[in-house]
């Protein structure tokens, strides 16, 4: 049975601690407190609320914007997905309906998870066929995990099955033989392994190649960030932490290049787990979500 955050909507604060806004929003923060198939760490259902609460401690000034958020734009944190549905497919369809509401609002939606298994549901509600840009420790290309084809470990495979055009993934460092074979054989999958982009001697050149590859993407893009794509020292409380990952600045630069060069229509930040002894994981996730907001607003200014 899927785990839905017991926090419910009354515990949800507003992103960055900003006051509620009237009228149409420019950016929507949409929490999806969903956990069904997390392998190792538990608690991703509580992640969105923890991330939003932590965002109240994030500085509002953005050096590229040259001003504090919301920078004259309207940021709204909407009510979380309700979790209705008795089966996994009903849950995913419900996430799709929830996502469709956010897309149809005309605002830029940022979905907060919850486990990475939310992604196929989000794309069911997306009005356009998208190319995925994925930051992750795991390829998420398994055909199934423990008999479940919609496990978090299958999120990208199912998203491709359900119509995503392609995936460009970076930070990958934990995957199985079946996934390795698929990466080699499927022309829709472009993988930049952590061992290459983080290589102490040659990683810099490979990283620049990754950034250049993003500039070649045509059409709508959905950015999906599993925070375990970052090094485990930055996100110790996540669904499946893995050492050897990206730095915060790698993620920051990826977001900049994407929004400067591509038609990014939505994003998600997922696999956030609240941690009692240190807020580092949720604060890192909050900073990433805030970076996405800033990059999107900057792209509006430059239109």
PLM regions: where:
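Active-site pocket-lining segments that scaffold enzyme catalytic pockets across diverse folds
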Residues: 87-160
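Single conserved hydrophobic/aromatic residue that forms the stacking wall/gate
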Residues: 1-8, 12, 301-302
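Short glycine-enriched, charge-decorated loop/helix-capping segments at active-site entrances
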Residues: 145-148, 237-244
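Short, electropositive alpha-helical surface patch
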Residues: 85-88, 92-95, 183-196, 274-297
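N-terminal catalytic or cofactor-binding beta/alpha core of small enzyme domains
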Residues: 21-111, 116-119, 173-175
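Active-site rim beta-loop-alpha module in soluble metabolic enzymes
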Residues: 166-236
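Active-site flanking residues adjacent to catalytic metal/cofactor-binding acidic residues
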Residues: 30, 114, 135, 170, ...
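Gly/Ser/Thr-rich active-site loops/lids in small-molecule metabolic enzymes
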Residues: 134, 241-256
């Amino acid at each position: 049975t899927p785990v839905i955050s017991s926090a419910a909507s009354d515990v949800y604060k507003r992103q960055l601690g900003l006051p509620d806004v009237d009228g149409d929003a420019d950016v929507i923060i949409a929490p999806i407190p969903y956990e069904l198939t997390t392998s190792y760490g538990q608690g991703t259902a509580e992640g969105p609320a923890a991330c939003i609460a932590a965002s109240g401690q994030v500085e509002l000034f953005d050096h590229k914007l040259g001003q504090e958020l919301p920078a004259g734009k309207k940021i709204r944190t909407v009510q979380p997905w309700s979790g209705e549905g008795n089966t996994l497919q009903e849950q995913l369809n419900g996430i799709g309906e929830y996502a469709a509401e956010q897309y149809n609002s005309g605002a830029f939606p940022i979905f907060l998870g919850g486990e990475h298994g939310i992604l196929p549901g989000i794309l069911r509600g997306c009005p356009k066929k998208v190319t995925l840009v994925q930051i992750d420790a795991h390829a998420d290309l398994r055909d199934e995990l423990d008999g479940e084809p919609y496990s978090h470990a299958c999120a990208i495979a199912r998203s491709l099955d359900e119509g995503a055009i392609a995936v460009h993934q970076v930070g990958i460092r934990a995957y199985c033989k079946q996934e390795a074979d698929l990466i080699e054989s499927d022309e829709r999958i472009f993988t930049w392994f952590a061992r290459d982009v983080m290589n102490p001697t040659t990683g810099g050149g490979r990283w620049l190649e990754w950034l250049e590859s993003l500039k070649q993407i045509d059409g709508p893009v959905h950015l999906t960030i599993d925070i375990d794509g970052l090094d485990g020292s930055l996100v110790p409380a996540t669904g499946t932490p893995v050492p050897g990952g990206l730095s915060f600045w790698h993620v920051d630069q990826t977001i900049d290049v994407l929004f400067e060069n591509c038609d990014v229509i939505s994003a998600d930040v997922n696999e956030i787990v609240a941690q009692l002894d240190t807020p580092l994981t949720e604060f890192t996730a909050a900073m990433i979500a805030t970076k996405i907001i800033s990059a999107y607003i900057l792209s509006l200014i430059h239109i």
